[in-house]
């Protein structure tokens, strides 16, 4: 962490002690009998962003859906703060690859959808929506519709909606893949501090990405998935100060390390 971030009152400390989300011996078998992955063991710690990388077809996106229980795993257990979960929970939010906004709703209503099922008043809901839009820098665009916003703005709406339900864990499935590189890079620069702001309830986050530069830029730890059926073949801790830049030789060292680790194991 950079000295500037360490002194930022809006940025949480990083003790990396308490386990937040954990899965044990997780496996998933598709209805056709194909095994997506097997015996997956991973965990996230307090205020930690964990990345999952691996070739296409190794079940990374499926794993995120299993962790959120949108699709139950076939075998294994998932724990949130030490308690086993067996159904979808508002404590775990998932951002999909596609930029999911409802075109007939303005920004406020798109975020408000994330509060469906919450036992709160209309006034409380409106305040949460306003707070989340402010957090992602879109407070002045509350009445705008998706067609009036850029791809980056729409993705911010998706992030605000995911955070509105006060989750403890945020799962991100290739969140920048459909953005142009300039927009994606700008959002990457902000996402780490955004999700771990003291203004959110998040304790940890998991990112699935094929972009290794993105992974080194954002992740505290990386799990590598390979094989068929896929398993976790490596775990890499990335110990770099923030904000991170590719101009840093240590950044490039981690990138080379990750590439060298992936090639013989995954042939990518």
Task: Give, region by region, the residue ranges found by the protein language model.
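Conserved ABC ATPase signature
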Residues: 145-149, 153
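The feature captures the beta-strand-to-loop junction immediately N-terminal to the Walker
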Residues: 53-55
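Conserved ABC transporter NBD signature motif
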Residues: 76-88
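Helix-to-loop junction immediately C-terminal to a conserved catalytic motif
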Residues: 68
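Short coil-to-helix segment of the ABC ATPase nucleotide-binding domain corresponding to the Q-loop/switch region
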Residues: 105-112
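Conserved ABC ATPase "signature" region
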Residues: 112, 123-141, 190-196
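Conserved catalytic motifs of ABC-family nucleotide-binding domains
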Residues: 166
